[in-house]
A protein has these predicted regions:
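Extended recognition/assembly regions associated with phosphoester-bond processing machinery
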Residues: 1-84, 89-237
């Protein structure tokens, strides 16, 4: 259960497929019955890769992401983490300081079980995952009737609801005047829920939800449902 601490993140309770979840404004899901945090598309190392190629991008994204995960662990008292693919970005070698940072963080949370459902960017990085003492599995991973995947289209047994990543979903919301603001979102239909990308330097993909989809936008440290006219406008936009 959430701990009452200063700066506690707000959350939106959500039920689907007979399970209760909490959608969090840091783009993760807390699963109380499993004491688990679900997150997708961290893409650790992407900014460092760009900097190595001479592209000026901000430093410190790894620190920011690790702190967000740590805060969520402390606030939810979770005992396990499930990464829904693309834990790291595709690059052939790691800088020492980058690996050291991840290993130091992992050491601080040795009591947390960490499982990675392999994504397309995780191929060839098993040495790092072994160092991080992560359980690495192919999709889908079935946990209490939920199929944990990287790709939303992954085939699962009939009747299994999927939670997935890969898409980096976002929606455009009208701001002041004619301006549009692109913000990340969770999106659910009858068979799959897709998480927004957790990474600080990942980009997003604008979706066009169906009227029957449930869309939950993430902005200003809040998670809020887009329903009614707002949902229809998104579908038509």
């Amino acid at each position: 259960m959430f701990q009452r601490r200063s700066g506690i993140i707000s959350h939106l309770p959500f039920q689907i497929a007979g399970q209760s979840f909490h959608l969090l404004p840091n783009k993760t899901i807390f699963w109380p019955s499993q004491q688990a945090i679900l997150l997708a598309d961290t893409h650790f190392g992407k900014a460092a890769t760009f900097r190595n190629e001479g592209i000026p991008v901000p430093a410190g994204t790894t620190d920011v992401m690790l702190k967000k995960i740590s805060d969520t662990i402390e606030q939810t008292q979770a005992t396990s983490l499930y990464f829904l693919g693309d834990f790291c970005h595709s690059f052939s070698r790691y800088q020492k300081d980058f690996v050291s940072e991840l290993l130091a963080w992992r050491k601080a949370y040795q009591h947390i079980d960490m499982t990675l459902i392999m994504g397309n960017h995780d191929l060839g990085q098993r040495t790092l995952f072994h160092q991080l003492e992560m359980t690495v599995v192919e999709e889908p991973l079935l946990v209490d009737g939920i199929g944990l995947c990287h790709y939303p289209e992954t085939v699962v047994p009939r009747g299994i609801f999927k939670l997935a990543g890969h898409v980096h979903p976002s929606v455009n919301l009208a701001g002041g005047g004619e301006s549009l603001t692109k913000i990340p979102c969770f999106v659910f239909n009858e068979t799959v829920g897709v998480l927004p990308a957790f990474g600080e330097f990942t980009g997003t993909h604008r979706i066009k939800p169906e009227p029957s989809d449930q869309v939950f936008a993430v902005a200003d440290d809040q998670v809020f449902s887009l329903v009614g006219e707002a949902q229809l406008q998104l579908a038509a936009g």
